[in-house]
Swiss-Prot record:
GO terms for molecular function: bile acid transmembrane transporter activity; efflux transmembrane transporter activity; xenobiotic transmembrane transporter activity. Its main location: membrane. It is a multi-pass membrane protein. PANTHER family: AMINOGLYCOSIDE EFFLUX PUMP-RELATED (PTHR32063:SF32), PTHR32063. This is Probable aminoglycoside efflux pump. InterPro entries: AcrB_DN_DC_subdom, Acrflvin-R, MdtF-like. Residues 1-9, 360-365, 414-441, 497-537, 891-896, 945-971, 1027-1037 are cytoplasmic. It comes from Escherichia coli (strain K12). The gene is acrD. Belongs to the resistance-nodulation-cell division (RND) (TC 2.A.6) family. It is found in: Cell inner membrane. The chain crosses the membrane at residues 10-28, 340-359, 366-385, 392-413, 442-460, 474-496, 538-556, 871-890, 897-916, 923-944, 972-990, 1004-1026. Keywords: Cell inner membrane, Cell membrane, Membrane, Transmembrane, Transmembrane helix, Transport.
């Protein structure tokens, strides 16, 4: 094939240009994102039961839904929460790669059979099913800059005019509203009700009947009589619209003609639909929306569409209303991709300089440089064909591929130059001879490197998805690199290189002359050193065994994790006060935290958005969540201005706040997997010991974790048990008094929890009508005695006649995981300790709990455990496939061992570099380690291929090996140094995404340094030992 293109260089150029064109088109078509779709698809079922306690919700709603979620394909785990605010949610997480739409359909089908078992109030509110993740990709704050709108005006406008349009944007899974629209609020006065001998049910019945839209029909509708001359729509009663109209609703007409109207027994006003949240942006009253990504949607594209839609809506905002982006993930993605592109360009420049140093001829250096854009563009075409995206993983793989793809072209050019110098052949003749010599080595290198990465593509789960991005990208680049080296590079060598006279070399003057002298002198020393090693093999075998021991030691000592943490330009702060604390008490703590950020971190902080009433562990008056957005990475100090440094300082400051637990934490490495960095587990009650026993086990576990110095900030990601007022109904007394239990329940719900009655029209939008006791009549336990229920004889019976109340402790938020009662425990490893080690410690601590309690890992920790279990299999399969490819290449079962034995020499360097830099054994490191395995084998192949060929032609084994070492030293050092300098920008990068670049670059760089230094000595030793043990008969030339 090479000879064909040597004679037809224009044909080779045409193919290269076409490859570049297709790649260029692919780049503009490929989506951009931080990661591919790594988070498992989530389907969330949400139900509302106004006024219900968490225990009531769990018993009547949550468990009913859970028990019907059977027979779902690819379900990984299921979690549920029942909140004292009346909301229940069941989240089902499916294996990565599951079609989210199909998952939603299956969940909806199973839900249908559960609907009739749910309370009527829940059915009236509706049960929603959405494919959505757990974390926000955008948090938008809305503020009135001129103060013309109060917080409820802002919230109503946002809920009425912005929330729905944004929820219909393609890619949006769900939207959390930190505020609510207006509703018609009917605040009942129990004393006035009783004075008119009326009950709460009388009020709701009157509203239902008199606030209704009646479909009457038509005047002259078909079928009509002959000669009918008129057809018109008939309107009658319609929905009410104003508080005045509601006040005029007639509750009763007395015999004397007097009336009791709604305004006589209640205060009617426009009020908030929900009073759960209180939001602030940079200290000003605000409302907000949290945008969640639909499963399978592109984060970057969705965020851009949402912001574009907001810009369209903003032109209709009331005067003074503006939106601010309080939290977003796209800036980090853009910045990290830009940084990787910068790294890519730096790598190309460094590789060019290394090649020029060795080749010492601009034309010769230009040839492998031309191969770089051709192969990269071709790789983008392959990514497009596979439906992949431009993301952090594929770009990291591109940087790694830089060093790999120039190797093939370097080997070709270097060998052509050597033949021209030694034999005086023309460039065309030298190229033909060179390709005949090294074509087998090129194919062998491609096979081995492909063999290392191809098995990665077949692993499942989130880790497998990460592996696949690297695998497809690097293998595509490798295959294209070999094709370019056999098609374009020979054609370029034959046409671009200038002929050399026999014995003539480049670089005979100046710096290059000095460099060549030094290199040749060291090459001679190297050859003599190899000869000594071959004569003293036992000593070097002992050294090799010691190196193996060091490798195993480092492997066991290197801490583990899933993905490195990144400075994402934002973080969150959660606030939790003791149970029973009020919204105003929580707000005071929030104001303290705001003051700290704006005072001590003003050089780093762009904005602070706080929502009182919403927390990562649940909703309530005693919790708050704050979104901290930082200034651009370029505006912050690279050491003191990182998010990690800010969080560390904030943690020390917040430890002084005694009235609340304040936790500042980084977002999870992968959006949609957990709520923060660190580990995430569920403590489960397998024995059904009950809530109190589970809480005792939780407290015991947290106490044990607090005593362990390798753990930090281990906490329950939920709400603590709080005082609850239990109302006991004596049903015998109630029945004796003629009071219906349904009437008692309806009155309790209306008075204390609010009842949704029906809807009304407000400025062209349908909104809700709620009936509830006025605030002064539901503040104290004894207020229950103010309420009356009508018995079957028409008499008014007070609650004190059949009801008593008592205090007890209960949870405002109950959790379940995979069908068991559970509590979520989150935490972090102490500085210098990996999350993998922290997870091992937590597992050992759980074993100290009473029997019947166990743990399951969830979110990111689940994936970390999965990746840790897959890593040994990945290494083993890759090494096995490499061995088989080498066996096929050399037609020998023995020769591959001389290549395979070199692999640990690269691995120990990768481990040592990673360990010395304080990094961890994560997925990125594992990918880098596989790269090192392939490159270590590649260097060995360059020597073994030549030595084996000469040995088969009848040359002495010792001389053949030394000759191969002498001939291959320069290309080995050149390709290795090119690769090392190619990944140097990754290992030294700063700014967005530098954590991932360090994780990949450090291990690969360390591995290549050790593999290059050690392998050039050990490869000839292993080849000679293997050949002596398994000699071959020489083949005639």
């Amino acid at each position: 094939m090479a000879n064909f293109f040597i004679d037809r260089p224009i044909f080779a150029w045409v193919l290269a240009i076409l490859l570049c064109l297709t790649g260029t088109l692919a780049i503009f078509s490929l989506p951009v994102e931080q990661y591919p779709d790594l988070a498992p698809p989530n389907v969330r079922v949400t139900a509302n039961y106004p006024g219900a306690s968490a225990q009531t919700l769990e018993n009547t709603v949550t468990q009913v839904i859970e028990q019907n979620m059977t027979g779902l394909d690819n379900l990984m785990y299921m979690s549920s929460q029942s909140s004292g605010t009346g909301q229940a949610s069941v989240t089902l997480s499916f294996k990565a790669g599951t079609d989210p739409d199909e998952a939603v359909q299956q969940v909806q089908n199973q839900l249908q059979s559960a609907m009739r078992k749910l309370p009527q109030a829940v059915q009236n509110q509706g049960v929603t099913v959405r494919k959505t993740g757990d974390t926000n990709i955008l948090t938008i704050a809305f503020v009135s800059t001129d103060g013309s709108m109060d917080k409820q005006d802002i919230a109503d406008y946002v809920a009425s005019n912005i929330q729905d349009p944004l929820s219909r944007v393609n890619g949006v899974g769900d939207i959390d509203a930190y505020g609510s629209q207006y509703s018609m609020r009917i605040w009942l006065d129990p004393a006035k009700l009783n004075s008119f001998q009326m009950t709460a049910k009388d009020v709701t019945d009157a509203i239902e009947s008199q606030n209704a839209q009646i479909a009457v029909g038509q005047l002259g509708g078909t079928p009509s009589v002959d000669k009918q001359a008129l057809n018109a729509t008939i309107n009658a009663q319609s929905l009410l619209q104003t508080p005045e109209q509601f006040r005029d609703i007639t509750l009763r007409v007395n015999q004397d003609g007097s009336e009791v109207r709604l305004g006589d027994v209640a205060t009617v006003e426009m009020g908030a639909e929900k009073y759960d949240y209180l939001s602030r942006f940079n200290g000003k009253p605000a409302s907000g929306l949290g945008v969640k990504l639909a499963s399978g949607a592109n984060e970057m594209a969705t965020a851009e569409l949402v912001l574009n839609r907001l810009d369209e809506l903003a032109q209709y905002f009331p005067h003074g209303l503006e939106y601010k982006v309080a939290y977003e993930t796209t800036s980090f993605v853009k910045a990290s991709i830009e940084d990787v592109v910068k790294t890519l360009l730096e790598a190309i420049a460094l590789v060019f300089l290394v090649m020029y140093l060795f080749l010492q001829n601009f034309r010769a250096t230009l040839i492998p440089t031309i191969a770089v854009p051709v192969v990269l563009m071709g790789t983008f075409s392959v990514l497009y064909a596979f439906g992949y995206s431009v993301n952090t993983l594929t770009m990291f793989a591109m940087v790694l591929a830089i060093g790999l793809l120039v190797d093939d072209a370097i080997v070709v050019v270097e060998n052509v130059e050597r033949i021209m110098s030694e034999e005086g052949l023309t460039p065309r003749e030298a190229t033909r001879k060179s390709m005949g010599q090294i074509q087998g080595a090129l194919v062998g290198i491609a096979m081995v490197l492909s063999a290392v990465f191809v098995p990665m593509a077949f692993f499942g789960g989130t880790t497998g998805a990460i592996y696949r991005q690297f695998s497809i990208t690097i293998v595509a680049a490798m295959v294209l690199s070999v094709l370019v080296a056999m098609i374009l590079t020979p054609a370029l060598c034959a046409t671009l290189l200038k002929p050399l006279k026999k014995g003539e070399h480049h670089g005979q003057k100046g710096f290059f002359a000095w460099f060549n002298q030094m290199f040749n002198r060291n090459a001679e020393r190297y050859e003599k050193g190899v000869a000594k090693i071959l004569h003293r093999s036992l000593r070097w075998i002992v050294i090799y065994v010691l190196l193996l021991g060091g490798m195993v030691f480092l492997f066991l000592r290197l801490p583990t994790s899933f993905l490195p943490l990144e400075d994402r330009g934002m973080f969150t702060t959660s606030v939790q006060l003791p149970s029973g604390s009020t919204q105003q008490q929580t707000l005071k703590v929030v104001e303290q935290i705001e003051k700290y950020y704006f005072t001590h971190e003003k050089d780093n902080i762009m904005s602070v958005f706080a929502t009182v009433g919403s927390g990562p562990g649940g909703n309530g008056q005693n919790v708050a969540r704050m979104f901290i957005r930082l200034k651009d990475w370029s505006e912050r100090d690279s050491k003191t201005g990182t998010s990690f440094a800010i969080i560390e300082r904030a943690t020390k400051a917040f430890n002084q706040i005694k009235e609340a637990r304040v936790i500042a934490s980084s977002p999870p490495a992968i959006s949609g997997l957990g709520s923060s960095a660190g580990f995430d587990m569920e403590l489960q009650d397998h024995a059904g010991a009950g809530h109190d026993a589970l809480m005792a086990a939780r407290n015991q576990l947290l106490a044990l974790a607090a005593e362990n110095p390798e753990l930090t900030r281990v906490r329950h990601n939920g709400l603590d048990d709080s005082p609850q007022l239990q109302i006991d109904i004596d049903q015998r007394k109630a029945q004796a008094l003629g009071v219906a239990i349904d009437d008692i329940n309806d009155t309790l719900q209306t008075a204390w929890g609010s009842s949704y009655v029906n809807d009304f029209m407000d400025r062209g939008r349908v909104k809700k009508v709620y009936v509830q006791a006025a605030a002064p009549y539901r503040m104290l336990p004894d207020d229950i005695n103010l309420w009356y229920v009508r018995n079957k004889d028409g008499g008014m019976v007070p609650f004190s006649a059949f009801a008593t109340s008592r205090w007890e402790t209960g949870s405002p938020r109950l959790e379940r995981y995979n069908g068991y009662s559970a509590v979520e425990i989150v935490g972090e490893a102490a500085p210098g300790v990996s999350t993998g080690t922290a997870m091992d410690i937590m597992e050992s601590l759980v074993k100290q709990l009473p029997n019947g309690f166990g743990l399951e890992w969830t979110a990111m920790s689940y994936q970390e455990r999965l990746s840790g279990a897959q890593a040994p299999a990945l290494y083993a399969i890759s090494l096995l496939v490499v061995f088989l490819c080498l066996a096929a290449l050399y037609e020998s079962w023995s020769v591959p061992f001389s290549v395979m034995l070199v692999v640990p020499l690269g691995v120990i360097g990768a481990l040592l570099a990673t360990w010395m830099r304080g990094l961890e054994n994560d997925v990125y490191f594992q990918v880098g380690l596989l790269t090192v395995i392939g490159l270590s084998a590649k260097n060995a192949i360059l020597i073994v291929e030549f030595a084996n060929e000469m040995n088969q032609k009848g040359h002495d084994l010792f001389e053949a090996t030394l000759h191969a070492c002498r001939q291959r030293l320069r290309p080995i050092l050149m390709t290795s140094l090119a690769f090392i300098f190619g990944v140097l920008p990754m290992a030294t990068s700063t700014g967005a995404g530098s954590g991932g670049q360090h994780a990949v670059g450090t291990g690969v760089m360390g591995g290549m340094i050790s593999a290059t230094i050690l392998a050039i000595y050990f490869v000839p030793l292993f080849f000679v030992l293997v050949r002596r043990r398994f000699p071959l008969k020489p083949r005639p030339e």
